[in-house]
Amino acid sequence: GYVGRGALDIQAVGDIFAAPSGQLVFEALQKADKGHGVLLLTLNYAGDQLAGKQAMKLAKKAGMNVRQVVTGEEIQFDPNGEDNQRGLAGAVALYHVAAAAARAGKTLDEVAEIAQKYADSMASVTVKVTDATHPQNGMSFGDLGETDLMEIGAGQHGEGGGVRVPMMSAKDTVATVAKALTAKLGMTSGDKAF
């Protein structure tokens, strides 16, 4: 989980590979509200976005002070050229950045601004060498099968949408991914990230 000191106060969780309901997210917002407002951190996935929007509407109707930050840092190697960036592992660091700002006494608006700036300044990419399998029903996510291919930009659960390339060594894979990450962030050799 992601709940604890220096991290989230509460987390709304759906079923395996599924988003929580908007009602569940709203109930989590209510439980997290200690009178200073609540920041809702959401990954850019359709189900998470839908639940977040529904929860935000319910929170507004209830008179709650809530802000939302969406992370969509994944570089998707979409062969169709669509820019549909999904939220990935960068969200974990985002949780800690937002928590640190809150613990430092920042207002909700300041915490949201810091978190959004961080979310907009990061990038991640996935590399899939085998298909993911649902632990309950054994369903496979993807169709790489027994090939000599790997997929770059396959998403959090390996759901696909990236580009398939011949299997590379770890060194070549890192070089490919690093080039994409630095390009996305507008960095060149010698630049400092922080």
Regions found by a protein language model. Give the residues of each.
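Internal, active-site/partner-interface "lid" segment
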Residues: 77-86, 95-162
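Gly/Ser/Thr-rich loops at beta-strand to alpha-helix junctions
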Residues: 1, 43-52, 86-91
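Short, acidic/small-residue loops that bind anionic groups at enzyme active sites
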Residues: 11-16, 60-84
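Glycine-rich oxoanion-binding loops at beta->alpha junctions
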Residues: 4-35, 182-184
